[in-house]
Amino acid sequence: MILPKGKARVGSLLADRTEAGSDGSGMLYGFDYSCGLQATLAICDGFVRAVRLHGSTTGSSIFPARNEPASIPETALVPSNASARVSAMPQNGLRVLVTGASGPIGAALLPSLKASGYQVTRFVRGQPSSEGQIQWDPSQPIAAELVSGFDAAIHLAGETIVGRWTDDKRARVRDSRTLGTRHLAQALAHAKKPPRVFISGSAIGFYGDRGDEILREDSAPGQGFLADVCQEWEAAARPAKDAGIRTANLRTGLVLSADGGALPKMLPPFKFGLGGRLGSGRQWWSWIHVQDLVGAMHHIMKSDLIEGPVNGVAPGPVTNGEFTKTLGSVLSRPTIFPVPEFALALALGRDASKELLLSSQRVEPALLVASGYPFHYSELKKALQAILR
């Protein structure tokens, strides 16, 4: 591929920033064994109710060890002077379409967009209850005129993965993502006035269970139900890309927020000193503070050359054991009650417990770092302190 003038591969830019000493700055659980297995399963169920596919299984430096050079697909390009080449896209009056805005990510995103001067329109499943809402059914095609005239579209909608993974449940999880994304992407592609950028949700579940391997945007997909769904999810956004719309697939990690998601569900047992690691605790968890995830979306909208897969994680992944100890430290509580794998399997089923809680994904936000996104929270302890204190 011939690189346009003024552009450089992310891999090259990342190497430049690393040599300069840049650090890229500038699910969970709770189990109470004292109450027996029934309480354990109940708490586990509470945790899973906090996890959605777009943010489920999912420091100081980008990673504790860097034994391999960063390399990013040629389709993911950023300018060699990234900070100076962020587009001066005027924000006041820009129209943004958002789906899936009722979750903790959307709850943080919407006020942020409005505070920045964007005009926000939401696609909602139920009857519209206020101005700026449009009813839609993700399983049905969307009229192109409904999505015409927007400057950006952010697609976060998808069926929750709560519950055991029966065949019917798997189908709903898959179809809500692939059909909804495909129908939206096709409508955007045929719109008379299509958006300049389409940010479509995905998840680091794309990578599967990878042990200690460092995972970047160009890493191969993994195996398993979630990995398969994520691959189909990203492919479903292709009609927008093929129509010339800049399309980014935001592979979100574990989102930390005080207003929803996994963290509030896991706090009660930890506050009582009953928290502990899951299984061996050696599995890597790649997390991100919700403020940084929202900031990353703003960054993608403004940075004209960011496209393709984008890892929505902080540059400081930790093992589950480290996460457990850090949370206990922030709460000033012990973390001495580990949860065995069999308890997770009893609560969720073997496949769901393995993919949601025990899979290891050590993910690096190579593209966000290389394109100059200034993370507010690169260290887990500071992120948890900001949320909990």
Placement of each model-derived feature along the sequence:
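C-terminal amphipathic/interface module of NAD(P)-dependent oxidoreductases
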Residues: P79, S83-P90, L94, E355-R389
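Conserved beta-loop-beta element that borders a ligand/cofactor-binding pocket
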Residues: S202, A235-A258
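Conserved Rossmann-fold NAD(P)-dependent oxidoreductase catalytic core, especially the SDR/UDP-sugar
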Residues: R182-G224
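Mid/C-terminal beta-alpha module of Rossmann-like enzyme folds, strongest
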Residues: A88-P90, S303-D351, Q385-R389
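Glycine/proline-rich active-site loop of Rossmann-fold NAD(P)-dependent oxidoreductases
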Residues: Q231, A243-I245, L256-K265, I300-V310
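NAD(P)H-binding glycine-rich loop region in Rossmannoid oxidoreductase-like domains
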Residues: P128, G132-G180
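Alpha-helical substrate-binding/gating segment
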Residues: L267-G275, Q283-P317
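N-terminal Rossmann NAD(P)H-binding glycine-rich loop of SDR-like oxidoreductase domains
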Residues: V96-A115
